[in-house]
Amino acid sequence: QRMYSRRLNASYKKIEEVSKIKDSFLAIYMEKCVDYLNKVDKYRSSLRHAVKHEGADAAIAMLRAPSFADGEFKDLLADFDSAFLGIFPDFVEKVNEHMQPEHCLQMPEKNALSTELRILALIRMGISKRSKIAKVLNMSVTTIYSYHSNLQKHSLHPDSSFDKVIANL
């Protein structure tokens, strides 16, 4: 009965941890959505201003400029990296425990994940379909397969258990 009680307590702790992680990500997601909606509204206002004061050609030039979407995507990735590492501060170390020593992964800078680490972070979060990972990271499915295949090949689990190991970190 003690064994059962310990297992039950461990399960409760795991559920509590998962609940806190979900709450954290939900709060971050909501904040990001509100920020994005405010930026879109500001962008719309600047387009209206451009049409009114500078003409349609100025507004068309603004619409053709990729800077708004590109900047937002970079900000989204930076926010994701920061949030993920805030919740899982030892993620990179845990990943590297499952990689061949000569193929350990590094963060390109403090609080920033590389593409490889982002792919693994998404797998850790339960997003395992390559098509969904590709969509989130704005990459082709082929590119994601290539990255993932390379990661798996250089892991200590070059079989199909690699994703399961990462998901359970």
Predicted regions and their residues:
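Membrane-proximal linker segments that couple transmembrane helices to downstream signaling/catalytic modules
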Residues: 3-115
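Cytosolic nucleotide-binding catalytic cores of signal-transduction proteins
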Residues: 68-169
